[in-house]
């Protein structure tokens, strides 16, 4: 597997105006071939999406989803650039899909890994570095393993990193990128809230035998 250097990533970024992470993924998939990486970005619609991702998105929808039985509910705000797009079926279906995704993702806490404060990341890294299974390893190796674990931890909690429930071959972030390329406007998930019935409440625990006895009048 070809080594992907920061210089290669920046070169691809300059040519395509695509984000660093997408450039790195494309280069890895293309085994370091710049032209193949550009072609991959084109095929995935990422190049087209990259041109509008920095544009301000202040329109959109607040979508909701209530799971069958009414035990789980979701509210999510998804922004786009124009009211015209917000009223379109393509965008509205995307919002519904994202709300359903959040309902099905109990571990998700934030939209993107970028939303996590560096202080929180540093604190988790400090904890991981001191794990007992790493203490015997060389400092450099220990730091690399710890960083990998922390990255994995936050990715598991980020909405955009989750495999899309309707197509596990892409992430939620990649789904949104595809929609940006198709619709031609910037789209961003701004915030969300997930509600679970009874979450945080302490249920009264009863002795089953005593409860039955009380109901039958034998106590």
Swiss-Prot record:
Keywords: Cytoplasm, Elongation factor, Protein biosynthesis. Its main location: cytoplasm. One of its GO terms (molecular function) is translation elongation factor activity. GO terms for cellular component: cytoplasm. InterPro entries: EF-Ts_dimer_sf, Transl_elong_EFTs/EF1B, Transl_elong_EFTs/EF1B_dimer, Transl_elong_Ts_CS, UBA-like_sf. The keyword Protease does not apply. The keyword RNA-binding does not apply. It is found in: Cytoplasm. HAMAP family: EF_Ts. Belongs to the EF-Ts family. This is Elongation factor Ts. The gene is tsf.
